[in-house]
Amino acid sequence: MAQAHPRSGTRLFRTYAARGVRGSQRQPGGLAEQWFQPPNLKRAFSSSLSDSNESPAVASDDPDDPDFPGSLVGQRRRRPRGSGSRNQRTLTNTPRVQRLRPRPPQKCSTPCSRLRPPPFPNCSPGCLGSDHSVCIQSRDSNELGTSASLFSSPASPGAPDPLYADSAVPGSFHLPAASLSEPSVPCPQVAATGDRYTGRALRAEASFRSSLFSLVNSGATEENKFGTDGENVKESCCERRQQMGNRLTDPDLTSPGKRKAACKKVVSQGVDQRDYEESSACKDLRVPGEISRPKRTGPLRKRKQQEATGTPPRHYHQSKKKRKASVSLWNLNTSQRDSWTKTRASFGFHKKKIITSVIEVCSSVASSSSRSLLSECSTPPIKNRAHLTVSSRCSSVYLLSPLKTLHVTDQRPSYAEKVYGECNQEGPIPFSDCLSTEKLERCEKIGEGVFGEVFQIINDQAPVALKIIAIEGLDLVNGSHQKTFEEILPEIIISKELSLLSSEAYNRTEGFIGLNSVHCVQGLYPPLLLKAWDHYNTTKRSANDRPDFFQEDQLFIILEFEFGGVDLERMKTKLSSVATAKSILHQITASLAVAEASLHFEHRDLHWGNVLLKKTNLKELRYTLNGKTSTIPTHGLQVNIIDYTLSRLERDGIVVFCDISAEEDLFTGEGDYQFEIYRLMRKENKNCWGEYHPYNNVLWLHYLTDKILNKMKFKTKCQSAAMKQIRKNLQHFHRTVLSFSSATDLLCQHSLFR
């Protein structure tokens, strides 16, 4: 099942840099060149911001400067305002102007005061990083044809806005007090014409500026509300200025009575994009170590561009049904909330795994987000590993950490080569080489998620499950970005590691779903799979897009798992007795305990949709914990644990986890005890998701016990003394489970499992 501002990302992923840095970061060597060397700190800025009585005007020698050629700022002609008379004469001898002309773009000498909004991101050289404060704009940057000061909020008397106090001006400069509390007068001669005209002109400018500021904020309100910490802007500077220019030239905005309605329209358009942008917040924010991928056009913006150019939409998969269903997860009725699959699809919650070393866990989590973090130097393998686990095979976890040896740096395989290596392939193969027509004739779709589709086929006279994931493409899949080779590799290796616990000697369990094979294929979606998809959609109503839009060069990863059975949620009325429920709980606890001992494993999302049950003829199942083998009565059912999207795993000094510290939607859910477990996990690890806290497994065991006691109905009633005693034991387990520290502690110490 399925996440990165970044437009998510997530989905197995990692980065080293901190997120949420305001503005774009300058690279070394990209510093702005000084236009002049200020001889005096008081004269470092243009006279438009300084008091004309304290310092003389500064002349400019640049032909593009608005004060050129060498004339004093005080002699600039006055521009007529809307509230003034059209026939009123100016103080200069320039011809009368019939319309408002655009001002030239600002130059380096124009200060960037605290009253200005933050610079547009991703706009070089007009944007500033956190280490530069002087605003430098390109000559064609101001497409609106008016002063950039119009886009600052109206100055309020009193303290300036503290939000940009540190980045507005350099610390070595001092702004006059008047400039911080009063709007600057564009021309000294205007003030000399009299109080009546000055007041009229200032009121007109303030009114115009206030209207523009409200228009700008109307579009930014929704973005800041649903973005990560309200700090990341999701549009490039050019797109933002183009949108504002369209608003200013809109004839509907010429009438003051229509401005309010226009603002409401802009806000409503932002709400339409909210669900998609939640999963892609901070996508435009580049950080060191981030994957370089082509910028993809969002579905709403892509549709608008196609309408503007007259081209029909090619792949617009965000249907009206899906948009309505994803507006609010928590407004659904109780019956719709019962299925976590539906809720998970609305989240787009397929996050990218973070990969780091054990030593770097805490520092990495503090400085990373749910984006990609890939450790450039892994720690040495844990000494005395045999004391923890005796491995009978070679682990592939080392592939997640790039080699640092100098003489093999240029020979380091790419992530694509690593994935092909795990598939035992040299490159992608056709669908037909992996899935023959004979296999697909009896194909059936059995599940889905944001990641893709799950089908069941018959292979070697046994049912198997195929998890098909599209990778490396530009098309959105179910509203989310496709994974890359780097992002899919950890999922392959984690599934492989947990599957191979069934072949270990020192810590062994068969409780995790078995991975049979992995393939990377290329081509169109097979027609027989589309037929199975259509049947599923007819009978159960799929929440996914029909996978018929892929091109011939599309890549897919096919994970072939053993058939795990039916999830516990759908079996809530089909279990024979409470003794069967006890066996299920025992098997889950044993599997988690073995994974804790071998891999420092936390599942972190073990709801009853991720517990599969299938029939077995075995009377007992064996597991080995720290070299000691024990048995569990099956009562005819075998448990398989699935879905490691949020899981945490550690092997050979490498930690793989999913940082969900910024996923507020996950921690604000209501209507099921499951959502309380997420909040309890965050309380346990203090939102540091790279650390190992096996108590989180205990929390999920408490959740599953609650479901067994309160939500499940058994075919055989608890009438016999033996059944009544088992139920009492389960109730005692439910009351006492939270006092244990781990699944291993529970398995070894609790009376239910003795």
From Swiss-Prot:
Ranges annotated as biased composition (Polar residues): 45-55
Post-translational modification: Autophosphorylated on both serine and threonine residues. Strongly phosphorylated during mitosis but this does not appear to significantly affect its intrinsic kinase activity. Phosphorylation by AURKB is required for full activity toward histone H3 at 'Ser-3' in mitosis.
Primary localisation category: nucleus
Biased composition (Basic and acidic residues): 272-287
TM regions (residue ranges): none
Source superkingdom: Eukaryota
Similarity annotation: Belongs to the protein kinase superfamily. Ser/Thr protein kinase family. Haspin subfamily.
Record-given protein name: Serine/threonine-protein kinase haspin
